[in-house]
């Protein structure tokens, strides 16, 4: 498991445009009087003399007015395009550092090196978050498209950039709607798509449930996982429906399971779990009662 992101730099460009002091199409008039006549300044810098206009020769003023201003929008788009191209180059270099020699993808060995450079364990929650953002289809593999799209999604194009995104990803995963999306992604992520799997192996499901609930461990989770662990023969796999409904189960059923009803539309495995757990608690309670009373109803301190 692992993932990357592209950090797109968009430096802003604030190029000003020059405006002439005068409209070059206007005529410059001198006052009419004895010995004076109206003088017209030809457009685009062909003056009739070196008369100053606001401290600038007419030739210079007219030429300056005829210059077309540079569009700040065009300059900004060009700057953004250059930044995106540079970011793609950095992503290409990063991807090549970990990709397989024969396949255009990061496989298990490259994933280990990638996680090592990120200073994370391949089995920890942060790597699952990267896989979620990369929308990885398979564990221990990032295709070129997944890697590039994922890096762009988190705006990172370097190891340092990806590491810097971890805190915000952890925060995002605490949002109810985002966690639901992550939770459902995790089921698909655990499947072996190349083999056409439609349900998770029991051991894989247990590991993924522990992983996805890293930040928010529901009270019933440990009981549920104990049930799955202690009943291996009766549970071959976990379907998508069971996986998805378990999240609802943790949200509406209390830790004492007292408000669970078999009449509601829960998967049959949940009925079996609740029955098993209630029996276990009953036996546990009876065992504690027997220890506290001792033989013949005597308290332990009264026994010899």
Curated annotation (Swiss-Prot):
GO terms for biological process: negative regulation of cell growth; negative regulation of G1/S transition of mitotic cell cycle; negative regulation of protein neddylation; positive regulation of apoptotic process; positive regulation of protein neddylation; protein neddylation; regulation of cell cycle process; regulation of protein neddylation. It is found in: Cell membrane; Cytoplasm; Nucleus; Cytoplasm, Perinuclear region. GO terms for cellular component: cytoplasm; cytosol; nucleoplasm; nucleus; perinuclear region of cytoplasm; plasma membrane; ubiquitin ligase complex. Residues 1-86, 284-304 are annotated as: Disordered. One of its GO terms (molecular function) is cullin family protein binding. Keywords: Cell membrane, Cytoplasm, Lipoprotein, Membrane, Myristate, Nucleus. Residues 86-278 form the DCUN1 domain. It comes from the Eukaryota. It holds the Pfam family Cullin_binding. A lipid is attached at residue 2 (N-myristoyl glycine). Part of a complex containing DCUN1D3, CUL3 and RBX1. Interacts (via the DCUN1 domain) with the unneddylated cullins: interacts with CUL1, CUL2, CUL3, CUL4A, CUL4B and CUL5; these interactions promote the cullin neddylation and the identity of the cullin dictates the affinity of the interaction. Interacts preferentially with CUL3; this interaction triggers the relocalization of CUL3 to the cell membrane where CUL3 is neddylated. Interacts (via DCUN1 domain) with RBX1. The DCUN1 domain, also known as PONY domain, mediates the interaction with different cullins. The DCUN1 domain mediates the interaction with the N-terminally acetylated NEDD8-conjugating E2s enzyme leading to the NEDD8 transfer from N-terminally acetylated NEDD8-conjugating E2s enzyme to different cullin C-terminal domain-RBX complexes; the neddylation efficiency correlates with the DCUN1D5-cullin and DCUN1D5-E2 interaction affinities. This domain is also involved in CAND1-, cullins- and RBX1-binding. Contributes to the neddylation of all cullins by transferring NEDD8 from N-terminally acetylated NEDD8-conjugating E2s enzyme to different cullin C-terminal domain-RBX complexes and may play a role in the cell cycle progression by regulating the SCF ubiquitin E3 ligase complex, after UV damage. At the cell membrane, can promote and as well inhibit cullins neddylation. This is DCN1-like protein 3. The lineage of its organism: Eukaryota, Metazoa, Chordata, Craniata, Vertebrata. The gene is DCUN1D3.
